[in-house]
Amino acid sequence: MNNKNIRNIAIIAHVDHGKTTLVDALLRQSHVFRENEQVQERVMDSNDQEKERGITILSKNTSVMHGDIKINIVDTPGHADFGGEVERVLKTVDGVLLLVDAFEGAMPQTREVLKKSLALGLKPIVVINKIDRPGAQPEKVVDQVIELFIELNATDEQLDFPVVYASAKNGIAKMDLADETTDLSCLFETIINTIEPPKCEIEGPAQMLVSNIDYDDYVGRIGIGRLERGTMKVGMPVSICGKEDKITQGRIAKLYTHVGLKKVEVEEVGAGDIIEFAGLSDINIGDTVCDFEHPEKIPFVDIDEPTVTMTFSVNNGPFAGKEGQFVTSRHIRDRLYKELERNVSLRVKDGETPDSFEVSGRGELHLSVLIETMRREGFELLVSRPKVIFKEIDGVKCEPIELLVVNVPDDCVGNVIEKLGRRKGEMVNMEPAEAGHTKIEFRIPARGIIGYRTEFLTDTKGEGTMNHIFDAYEPYKGDIQARVRGTIVAFEPGKSVTYGLYNAQDKGDLFIGPGVDVYEGMIVGLNSRGEDLAINVCKEKHLTNTRASGSDDALRLVPPLQMSLEKAIEFIAEDELVEVTPKNIRLRKKTLDTKTREREARR
């Protein structure tokens, strides 16, 4: 295909502003699906966790045809934790669709991704989505976006961006709010007229930067990226410029381009198209694939450094090996280092002990998605509380500061400000949002956000939303008070019974019900007081000849609190761990023996 007929764009936005829904609508209206075909919502979110969480985790490619123009579309994650996915795919495109919710306006991740796009000189198209939402203020949001562009030092050319008003859910777009439209035609036309064809050298030796990796059971590792120069053919010998200027040789076995959601095998591809290739078994993200006789490396984009670290270690509890398939340090080590091949924001190094590993990422969600993936693959492991990564700058200890935006009901504002103030949060802006809600911005140490989300949802009766993104490293802000309540810890192994739990529930909130296998040192609840409490939840009522005046079977248990993986990771203190297995998520003390723990506490 002539590269004049190609447009490469990425869709960028804050989480939940409708990127994947817009891609769905573009695919439908370019007749990728048959008229009678049943298509699930958010078809691009193909990963199990993406479907369950309702978010995009991995960036993905697709393409649509509009007339004789091929539009390659890259759908990107909106969560700040997966920012590394966005940063590297921006190198493969020539323009971006900046999607902004007509109700919420520009949010933290919108700012961060736009900043990187403008720095790369990409041409923006602004799409104001959800114009049909009650309370939407599209004109006000356009003004916010213009202010944001000016703040981020956009060039005059970038400031001259087209604005399209859309409802991705209903599949309509218009250039003016007063227009009556029934489809996305004007968005297709705007993309074709605004985004330039790829600036590539048609002639010359082939050259391509690998920006993503996929895997296929039949052909092995697949490299994904944009062909920057020349032509690539099946069977041609190539040179691979890897890390530290290492050059290896290989041969292209298969070539693919995207047509809708399908990969189509081709014999030859010209510069400018986003392609996939197989045949190079040790290819990695950031490598450059070149003509065999002309190895020239393309510099890879700088990925932001991790801000949070956790310790992953071998499960050494009493139930170790009973529920998982991969339980040894070798299994965990191999899996973590394999993850580095495609998860460019991740850092892994060996821990202080032979069976532990320090894993660093962009946030709790980034690491919890990895843990959940490993759990589903059959791994058993222990994980520690997340810790922020400190840096020394000019001899001063510095910590990561986040920009936090919360939207809360008006009657909860005082409580939220007070709680975030205790966590060293500094309020920088406050304005009314929709009816009965207030939007507040804080600058807060990353330490202050860890463990706060569950408390925030309780304080706002489940109505509040919070979003945060890394802002800068600043001098250490001082100590932050940890969890104020202690835990209820089992001190006898066995099976929990109603009688034992009934006595325990007076002391606080329980995490387990009857009939659950427990071991000494396992956390079974949250104490209502500040200290930890060891209790026997396996204790049965002794039988006697004395008849009870009341009914013996009227022991009513309060339903236990359900602990998801994210809640468990947020909940634990420094002396606690989360035991993750394919079947269960348990909380436990680092030191299981009760007497040893009491001795350590007295020191």
Model-derived features with residue positions:
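P-loop NTPase switch module centered on the Walker A-proximal segment
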Residues: M1-E104, Q144, I213-D216
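Interdomain boundary/hinge elements
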Residues: Q38-R42, L152-V164, P198-L209, E244-H258, ...
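Canonical P-loop GTPase G-domain recognition
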Residues: K123, R133-N193
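Short glycine/threonine-rich beta-strand-turn micro-motifs
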Residues: S167, G351-H366
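Conserved nucleotide-binding/hydrolysis modules and their immediate coupling elements
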Residues: Q207-M310, P318-K322, R485, G494-T544, ...
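Helix N-cap motif at beta-to-alpha junctions
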Residues: R229-T231, S281-D282, G361-L367, D410-V413, ...
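Long insertion/accessory domains within large nucleic-acid-processing enzymes
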Residues: H258-V266, C398, I444, E455-D459, ...
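A short, contiguous, amphipathic alpha-helix enriched in charged residues
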Residues: G317-L340, A554, V558
